[in-house]
From Swiss-Prot:
Species of the source: Homo sapiens (Human)
PROSITE patterns, per the entry: FE2OG_OXY, LYS_HYDROXYLASE
Protein name: Procollagen-lysine,2-oxoglutarate 5-dioxygenase 2
Distribution of this protein across tissues and organs: Highly expressed in pancreas and muscle. Isoform 1 and isoform 2 are expressed in the majority of the examined cell types. Isoform 2 is specifically expressed in skin, lung, dura and aorta.
Glycosites: 63, 209, 297, 365, 522, 696, 725
Amino acid sequence: MGGCTVKPQLLLLALVLHPWNPCLGADSEKPSSIPTDKLLVITVATKESDGFHRFMQSAKYFNYTVKVLGQGEEWRGGDGINSIGGGQKVRLMKEVMEHYADQDDLVVMFTECFDVIFAGGPEEVLKKFQKANHKVVFAADGILWPDKRLADKYPVVHIGKRYLNSGGFIGYAPYVNRIVQQWNLQDNDDDQLFYTKVYIDPLKREAINITLDHKCKIFQTLNGAVDEVVLKFENGKARAKNTFYETLPVAINGNGPTKILLNYFGNYVPNSWTQDNGCTLCEFDTVDLSAVDVHPNVSIGVFIEQPTPFLPRFLDILLTLDYPKEALKLFIHNKEVYHEKDIKVFFDKAKHEIKTIKIVGPEENLSQAEARNMGMDFCRQDEKCDYYFSVDADVVLTNPRTLKILIEQNRKIIAPLVTRHGKLWSNFWGALSPDGYYARSEDYVDIVQGNRVGVWNVPYMANVYLIKGKTLRSEMNERNYFVRDKLDPDMALCRNAREMGVFMYISNRHEFGRLLSTANYNTSHYNNDLWQIFENPVDWKEKYINRDYSKIFTENIVEQPCPDVFWFPIFSEKACDELVEEMEHYGKWSGGKHHDSRISGGYENVPTDDIHMKQVDLENVWLHFIREFIAPVTLKVFAGYYTKGFALLNFVVKYSPERQRSLRPHHDASTFTINIALNNVGEDFQGGGCKFLRYNCSIESPRKGWSFMHPGRLTHLHEGLPVKNGTRYIAVSFIDP
């Protein structure tokens, strides 16, 4: 008989010794692993985009050998994003595979490069390929395209993805060659359809021995699988994990509309950022400005698109940037007539430091998009412009080195992270919703709060950013970047950049500054910033609270010129001046009359020539100021007393020889009183001061911006000393009446 025979008495022994080889001549040994130098990665790139450089960087990290086809060629494969095409890639593969057709031991891995990153190395790829036990393995997809009519021709798959994806495949060189040699179409024909027809042909599939990576062990296509793939940190490494199949794919492909998700994974994979080491690529390809003799030329685009609080300070910050002024040019678009006075004051200062300043005012009636296009052109059309730095007026840059830091990071587009104080609102989005608007990425809060520090590839950034001049003159040379459908200008810019394949980065490696809230900025007053204590408390404090205020609690600078009369710094010069200006602009001083309809009962026993905070709509601001800044001092000087921070009477008093020069002795209707000097004795007026009669103690040289704090009723009978000439202003509150 033909075949092999086994004697009955030896059957048991044979089964024990060779349980899987009942026939002589069968190979019982596992196949030896393929050496990593026998793996060749092939990709196609007719241009070197940001995505290509990221792909090559990940390949270099794992020591892949990569052959790039098509470099320097014109792309004739169609618009792969929105239509069929890609045949040029198959034609190039056909040409190159002829050189490897007889190398039986060579494994060829083809993958896209613009939207692919490696998450594992050659050894892992080859091990998984061998385990698949086929000659060629294609990436698998849950979505059938481009011809859905071919669904019935696919083999049935009970577990895993059923359809082929041409974005990645791996196989022995002779077998890959057999596939691509069948190509006889045009460069703009569809590569996906070509490979699909090879696979669904049962004879070809079996003859070449092709399978799909059904469970995404090697290739992970993200389109249609967004909910399957998560970021995983384990053993000091970052991987993308398919939670449906419990696999760790090696090549991650952000095909179709999933490029934003791929960018998110690319921030971590392969080990770009880990929990143990933080950002491992932050110093990659950076530049050192301290080593250059001449700094790059920067055009700064400034945009004032709505009434904005604290604008003079914003403009002054531009002049304090740590950057050579001779290398700067300024483009300013001001949409608001309200701010023209601020622009004029700034220009008169800046023109002595910055040679080129272009101002486009509200009379031009430009839309925001038109203005931003003009600002970008200000750099684009200047061959000497190395960088374009766009800054909106609602950005507070507290780091003078911001511009240098961004340039040194050496990215095409990069923004510094700025947030609203105490909030998660920032100038970037970590993800987009399906309709292209805000969605919160998994890492957004950690980035905003500084728990993860690095340089992050993001889909949207705004308010403040730096763009390379050569990028504006190459990939982004279209003038109308800020106009797109009905999108806001910032969203239009970001969408255009994404579609051009230009990565946008946000850096939180340093503290750069913050964002102002402009939503409720009321410009009906004379000094409108005074009302910003709720919307922008940090900025309000910086502008209006005395810089020595914190020393009250750290250096014990509170003075006591009279018994239980405490004296401390509270207001800045600007606060004093603006409060006086506001009252004078309002102008309805009471005249120091006893009959006063503003108070309960309509009669004031000891009247002053004053204006109440309530009259200028400043009452709520003033009471909040008392709770935030006066109450802590109260607790320090009147130990054990906790103020409610409430006052019925809050007002600015005006003393002058012509109207009211002094105030007779009286007790205040308060538990304690604050009395803040708003101008300077000796400069603005002579005389004045306060005398506490019971202690025979006078204070005749009040300091501007400093406050007295003393008990009100019962103990501290006092009087206002005569003003001899000039005008004296004080702000008074009767607290806890």
